[in-house]
Amino acid sequence: AALDGDRRIFLTAQKDIMTDDPDFNDLYKLGVVATVSHVAKLPVDGEMIVRVSVKGMYRARLNGIVSTEPHLVGAIRACAIRKYDIENEYGQALIRSAKSIFEGYAQSAPQLSPDIVLSVLGFDHPGDMADFIAGNIALELPDRQSVLEELDPIKRLEKLRDEQGRYMVDE
């Protein structure tokens, strides 16, 4: 359906992947509105797998389900994100700290592309940095969701920095 119109889709996680037919209560309420940028059908082990590439646009809250056939259609509302002052000294120190922790994480995670590491080092906004890192490191779903649900960019990067440090210790 997203491919027939403006290619926008609301993405949210299911709380329990074992639930075959999720309803409103089985879904996390905060997700992302994204644009579908590419769809590829690939043969894998004799089956066709659909791989979809998306670009996140903004956070949104799922307020309800308006239709279940042929797929779930939700009523959503965009979330207001707190503004960030780029001159904020604490924010800049937090970014430096997160970059340092990420570099350490990257050294222990050889599967990370050097391009991802370079991208992280180029960020100067805590919210954007947190979103990018969260999308590129191995986090458990509840931890990833917790980062997504934090709308304050400073608090989001603090939360991710703490999670990232915990995962480095656990690995």
Named regions from a protein language model:
Residues 1-171:
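N-terminal low-complexity, acidic/polar interaction/targeting segments
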